[in-house]
Amino acid sequence: MKKFLSFKPAEDFLRSLKKSSQWFLLIIIVEVTITLSFEGYVFHHFRLITVEKIDVFINAMVPSTFALFCMACPYLLYTAVDALLNKDVIQMSALLIFHVSLFCLSVVQYFQIFSKDPRAIFLSALYLIDPIRLVTSFNYHERIVVNSHMLLFYLKPFVIALPVLIGVTCILLSFLVYKMNKAFGWIMYQQHGPDLRMRRRYLVYKIFMSLIKSDYYFCLTATVQYAIFFSTISRVGLALTILVFPCTIATLMTCRYAVYRENRALLGIVQFMFMCGLAYFIYNCARLYLGVDYGDIAVANICMLVFSIVTIIYLFTTIVVGFYCISNFGYGLREYLRYIHQKQKVNAAPAVPKVRMPLDD
């Protein structure tokens, strides 16, 4: 029980970090905590706004952005810890690019939430409400709309603070990554050796692995957004969207195995699945943009459209780098990866304590 409750591995990990790495992890933890708090506060108060058909607008908009940021926070924390554990500057740089995309999405979220006045939404939805119920409960609905307008006013500082927080965090992390790149330079040289060609192949491999980790977040989060969105449109679309989950996870796991084992046939199948996924996201992106069968909800969900475009860019980049990885097969990268993995195990192993042998009299 004491071993189970022991925090010694975490303590050893924190002690092994330098000051710049500790600040890097601390900033990520603070950012994740504040982001979850702000998004949870906004989401909770938005759920209070329910006015007949107006709640369709709210239900289609707010949960999708809430799911986006809620899934981003564990991804940020995991990627930061993994990058510091492996002293992977490439993954840290990928984390900075991820922050830029998250900053753009937080700005889009602000314009999405405050683009329409609740009164205008209410008046545009009058024809959808039963006339008898409208006459008998108009004052009730009007009072809720006024309260909703005041609620949006009180929530505005929290929604504005989110892109400011992400932007400042990105600037601070950029400075720390620059310092850590200098500190880890000699360590990386000791691990990889002076062979420039092999180092370039290894660099492409690490970039591809970072893209795969990003694809986990973007593809699965986009699928969650589509599932929330399609739940208000059709059950068939919801069922098909849920089926994308296991296919995405299986494809990305197979991709990691195929690259590490240098299996051309398996990675070729994975590349084909990536192209199918790219076509799937382009199709949904086009439907969101054109507003087919969605009506006003498509106009409201700009954030989902922007997120789909970012997912398409990441997936397309993964496909391009994947073909580059296939061209590097057969040049000793597989053995090189095994050598680095064994070397990291040896370096991570605890030192054998020196035991004094007593002298015989």
From Swiss-Prot:
Organism: Schizosaccharomyces pombe (strain 972 / ATCC 24843) (Fission yeast)
Predominant location category: Golgi
Disulfide cross-links: none
PANTHER family found in the cross-reference section: UPF0658 GOLGI APPARATUS MEMBRANE PROTEIN C1952.10C-RELATED
Keywords, sorted A to Z: Golgi apparatus, Membrane, Transmembrane, Transmembrane helix
Gene Ontology cellular component terms for the protein in this record: Golgi apparatus; Golgi membrane; plasma membrane
Taxonomy, superkingdom: Eukaryota
Record-stated family: Belongs to the UPF0658 family.
Transmembrane segment boundaries: 23-43, 56-76, 94-114, 120-140, 158-178, 207-229, 233-255, 265-285, 302-322
Record-given protein name: UPF0658 Golgi apparatus membrane protein C1952.10c
Localisation: Golgi apparatus membrane
Mode of membrane association: Multi-pass membrane protein
Matches recorded under InterPro entries: UPF0658_Golgi
